Each structure stands twice: as C-alpha cells, then as structure tokens.
C-alpha cells in the first residue's frame, strides 16, 4: 500500500543507503500531518525542511515551532503572484510581509514557490525583477539547485512521475534526460527498489526529495478520499497542461 506512514518509513530506510539526499516538504494543507512526518524523521535521526504557506490551511505557529524544535528547518512556501493577481510590485510586498511574519516564529533562509496549478501566474517569475538572495534567502530550490548533478523527485499528484500531468512542479530542461537514463518512478516501491540496487543510475546523483505530507497517512477512509481526490485533480491538470502547451 503506497502513501502510508509505514511506506514512508520504508522510503527513509532505503534513502539511508544512498546517503546523499535532502528531504523537503511542501506544507500545502494540514500542518498536523507535517508534524507527524517530522516525528518519524526525527526518530530516524533525519532532518528535513518544511515549507509553509502563509494561509490558514498551512500556517500554524505552534506546529512550526514544534517541527523546528526537533532539528528540522522551516521555509516559506510563497504564492505571491497568484494572491496578488499578477501585480509584480504588490507581489513583492506580499512576499516581504509574509517572510517577516514567518521570521517572527523561526529563522527563515529558504523559500520555494507554491505551484498553484489553476493560476495564470508562476510566482517564481517575481525573481526576474527582484533579487531573492538580497532578502537573506540562501536557497530557492528551483533557482539554486544544479540539476545536472541532482535528481529531483516529488510526489506531486500522489505519484512519483506526476511531472507528466503537472503544470509547474517539474524541471522542464532535465526531465527528458532523466527519462532517457531510466530515472523515472511511479510508485514509492519503484524508488525503494532502485535505491536497493547499488548499480542503478539513481546512485549517480544527489537526491532532492519533495513530498506533500498531507498525502501520507494510515490506510482508511482518509487515505481513500485522498487517493480519489488526487486522481480527479490529475485529470484536471492533464487538461490544463494539454490546453496550455
């Protein structure tokens, strides 16, 4: 059974065979689910970065502090161009305001954009006009990662090959090359099996692992609901991708 807490533990165990990896989490919803994942990682002596949106369904001061207290770090999951309807100046001010709000809770030196698949705007485009690093942000994954040496794996769409239907959560200039090298995975078990094979090309790369903690839960009604919802969302995103491109 995929996307359960037990399966996540199995993934972490397999990742330890690789050694060169970073764990990143987009806290789009349900920060309490992120807290649960943070506990699992801490129990396994692993540290991760949790990117929080500054919206009621993600931002929770107490949970952020609890996660950081375990040795994890927090980042800002920004969506300023979407919330400001494409107004670049307003988006920049919105970014500054929310960054300041988060920094009153915990140090923040990393940020990544929320995908917002239904939005006309890609919030990452703000950095075509402003300098994110001048704001004390040392690392923006899509701007500061060398994807020639780092493999990006994300569970977007509740699958590990969700880039096929994703609007923005992908690395366009590298995805085809990774496919040619056999570095595409559909299930978590696919990744675990690759990590368990020392000769697999996955071991030629550093790994950047991105998950959405609200997708990982014990099997039950919540799991079934999430699986069904993501299937419908993937159909909608595929339509958007086909329409746009």
Residue map of PLM features:
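Histidine-centered beta-alpha loop that forms part of the nucleotide-sugar donor binding/catalytic region
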Residues: 53, 79
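Terminal accessory/targeting
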Residues: 1-24, 28-49, 58-59, 68-70, ...
């Amino acid at each position: 059974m995929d996307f359960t807490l037990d399966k996540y533990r199995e993934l972490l165990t397999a990742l330890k065979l690789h050694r060169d990896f970073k764990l990143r989490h987009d806290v789009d919803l349900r920060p309490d689910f992120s807290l649960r994942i943070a506990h699992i990682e801490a129990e396994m002596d692993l540290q991760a970065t949790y990117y929080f949106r500054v919206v009621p369904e993600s931002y929770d001061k107490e949970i952020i502090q609890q996660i950081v207290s375990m040795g994890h770090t927090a980042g800002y999951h920004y969506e300023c161009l979407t919330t400001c309807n494409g107004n670049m100046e307003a988006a920049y001010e919105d970014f500054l305001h929310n960054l300041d709000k988060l920094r009153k809770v915990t140090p923040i030196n990393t940020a990544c954009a929320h995908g917002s698949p239904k939005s006309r705007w890609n919030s990452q485009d703000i950095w075509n006009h402003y300098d994110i690093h001048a704001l004390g942000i040392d690392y923006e994954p899509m701007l500061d990662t060398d994807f020639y040496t780092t493999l990006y794996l994300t569970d977007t769409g509740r699958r590990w090959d969700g880039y096929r239907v994703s609007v923005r959560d992908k690395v366009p200039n590298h995805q085809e090359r990774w496919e040619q090298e056999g570095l595409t995975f559909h299930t978590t078990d696919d990744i675990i099996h690759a990590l368990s094979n020392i000769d697999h090309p996955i071991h030629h790369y550093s790994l950047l692992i991105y998950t959405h903690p609200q997708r990982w839960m014990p099997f039950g009604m919540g799991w079934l609901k999430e699986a069904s919802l993501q299937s419908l969302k993937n159909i909608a995103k595929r339509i958007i991708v086909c329409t746009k491109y």
